[in-house]
């Protein structure tokens, strides 16, 4: 999708600080980090929200989870811990409508959701 910023990052039209990449997923540093480590993990194909993952797309979800594990190792947060977040739709806080996971860590994270 030409109007999707994450699709444009996948295609190379917009630069990113790539952390991890496979044929199915791309992980890159968030440009507005909310923690010392804040990485965005996306499927390379455009899937708008978590609710748009049908049975035929479960392999993308599997690839995203593996990517989160690899990102945690690359960023050296796998031992102390980290948080993963998926925002879904407007009321869930989703701003960019291309499925993505946030990987946050590098410090003790607060427990509030604000």
Indicate residue ranges for each PLM-predicted region.
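HIT superfamily nucleotide-processing domains
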Residues: 1-114
């Amino acid at each position: 999708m030409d109007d999707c910023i994450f699709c444009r990052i996948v295609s190379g039209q917009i630069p990113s600080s790539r952390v991890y990449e496979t044929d199915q997923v791309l992980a890159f540093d968030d440009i507005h980090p909310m923690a010392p480590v804040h990485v965005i993990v996306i499927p390379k194909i455009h899937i708008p929200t978590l609710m748009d993952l049908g049975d035929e797309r479960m392999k993308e979800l599997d690839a995203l989870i593996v990517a989160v594990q690899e990102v945690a190792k690359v960023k050296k947060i796998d031992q102390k811990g980290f948080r993963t977040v998926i925002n879904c739709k407007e009321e869930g806080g989703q701003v960019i409508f291309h499925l993505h996971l946030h990987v946050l860590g590098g410090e003790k994270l607060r427990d509030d959701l604000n």
